[in-house]
Amino acid sequence: MTTGKPNILIIMVDQLNGKLFPDGPADFLHAPNLKALAKRSARFHNNYTSSPLCAPARASFMAGQLPSRTRVYDNAAEYQSSIPTYAHHLRRAGYYTALSGKMHFVGPDQLHGFEERLTTDIYPADFGWTPDYRKPGERIDWWYHNLGSVTGAGVAEITNQMEYDDEVAFLANQKLYQLSRENDDESRRPWCLTVSFTHPHDPYVARRKFWDLYEDCEHLTPEVGAIPLDEQDPHSQRIMLSCDYQNFDVTEENVRRSRRAYFANISYLDEKVGELIDTLTRTRMLDDTLILFCSDHGDMLGERGLWFKMNFFEGSARVPLMIAGPGIAPGLHLTPTSNLDVTPTLADLAGISLEEVRPWTDGVSLVPMVNGVERTEPVLMEYAAEASYAPLVAIREGKWKYVYCALDPEQLFDLEADPLELTNLAENPRGPVDQATLTAFRDMRAAHWDMEAFDAAVRESQARRWVVYEALRNGAYYPWDHQPLQKASERYMRNHMNLDTLEESKRYPRGE
């Protein structure tokens, strides 16, 4: 039975560099399932995160709002229950909504519109990872990134992250089977299942069978070598110091092994994606299901000597986005887009009036773009977390990228002429066009942001959370970490059930 609305499968991964997906996965990646998905997808070449860090990126992804609006500035900022997310919009429209995997919600609300959450999260839900602008330069050792992920890169058959993602995939597939059993029910609802993996996020450790795929890989060396600390821009210097770079001797072999493990973990994820699509196919739901593949932010992978994220360079800020399914014409789109566009796009595809969604989002629907009408709005990004001493903002429009922080010199890059972002045109304009472009971006920035107010809001949020966190660590502790609930008496075979009805209802397809 069809409801007239598409089912939706969102596959989200963590820290996947968008430069590796120029038109689907790069040729050298062993990713047959993602390559097959790309062939039938609308592919967005220049898609960007709203903020290059997990929790703010994901909160913005779900709401379609910038961090300055969600107030999820960092990995320990509470996500308020009153903020509408795509799960809320779809649920209002009659969808069943569920999450398997990571979303890094901070605070007592661990659902944010999802009716069901199949797993716990992999990261803490409390305020413990709060940075502190009052102490610039302080390195909080027990949770800040360090380069141990790079020097320790290699092979393992099980890790904390593998254990998590194996569970995420298993429970997601089980949920798809359960949903397929309802296909013939007159009262069934369309569904939106979000499956959110933590790979290929560091640590850079991969299973042997995927590691071996990249034995002869020619892409294990960064395009831009390590830039000395004193030649880096100020924010990159702060990132290096926050990652404790001076206490790690990162060798060329460490870099190669880290990148190899990262590529291997893309192949690991590809296998998981293949399992999900295979389940959709065998349960006859594929043709009625929209599939959206995305990442929260990227990873620098040693380019410029930088690792992880936390900046607006392409490796950190640019992320894959592919959408496949009924009504979606396959093709490559080059106009810059944003993860903020996902919520209005999902609403549009689900037949929800955008007038109901527009007040609650900073993004735009990509459906017109898929149908040939280009997106014209600039792409906005923000960062106000560890390694920053004041908020940073960025604007991507046309071939240009502009970066601003009140503490630092401005940056302007021409990404057509300088895709590796080696020439800052704000410092060395080539002529009047560059100067006029810089002036236009300054005006745009002033129109979009009150940087003093932004900074004050971040500082107030951090200070409040430090007070609350220290208090809650004294005495009895009530965790906010999500605990999935299962009713054992309603599973499998129990004496209060009609066993004949049970066996028939659990079978799908039936009568074959």
Curated annotation (Swiss-Prot):
Give yes or no: UniProt keyword Hydrolase.
yes
* E.C. numbers: 3.1.6.6
The record describes how the cofactor is bound as:
Binds 1 Ca(2+) ion per subunit.
Q: Which GO terms describe its molecular function?
A: choline-sulfatase activity; metal ion binding
Domain of life where this protein originates? Bacteria
The record places the active site at C54, H104
Tell me the leader sequence span: none
- GO BP terms in the entry: choline biosynthetic process
Q: Which UniProt keywords apply?
A: Calcium, Hydrolase, Metal-binding
Q: What are its cofactors?
A: Ca(2+)
**PANTHER family in the record, alphabetically?**
IDURONATE 2-SULFATASE
Primary role = Converts choline-O-sulfate into choline.
What is the protein name stated in its UniProt record?
Answer: Choline-sulfatase
Q: Which organism is it from?
A: Rhizobium meliloti (strain 1021) (Ensifer meliloti)
